[in-house]
Amino acid sequence: QFSRVAELVPARLSKSGEPKPFYEALLTKDSLTRRAFSSPSDLARVSEMNQPRAWQAGFPAMGGVGSALGLAKFYDWVLRQEFLEELIKPRIKGLDEIQRIENSFGFGVMLGLGPNRDCFGHPGAGGSYGFANVETGMSYAFVMNHFESNLFPNKERLDLVLSAG
């Protein structure tokens, strides 16, 4: 089904609203942020993620290939699982040493990503976003192949989430 995978298009450089500490860390050689965003080294550029070997690699923290509907269905499924309460229990809170912002995580998901603290999910590369709202039972996903230069979804995307949630 490789013919159904859209080509990823790198972001154009812009003056984004991203936190300055993140970009400073990203540009600092040997910083934790740079190491995290450069790993694995042979898949560090967007163009390399357009190759079937990247789609098949199955890295747990990057390179997911799917549709917005598929991602939203995944979060909808998670909402109905017995492990939900354990998944969204805060495990760590404070300064995220990679993203250089205050953050909170459960088991593999970021917490507080929507209109209430019971929202969980994760942003993806280039502005993609998937989350679920425990309070309303709603799941949401937005995927894109034309990357934005932001680490997190832009204001328009977040406004969509808040209006739907």
Stretch-by-stretch model annotation:
Residues 1-165:
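Catalytic loop of the DD-peptidase/beta-lactamase superfamily, centered on the K-T-G motif
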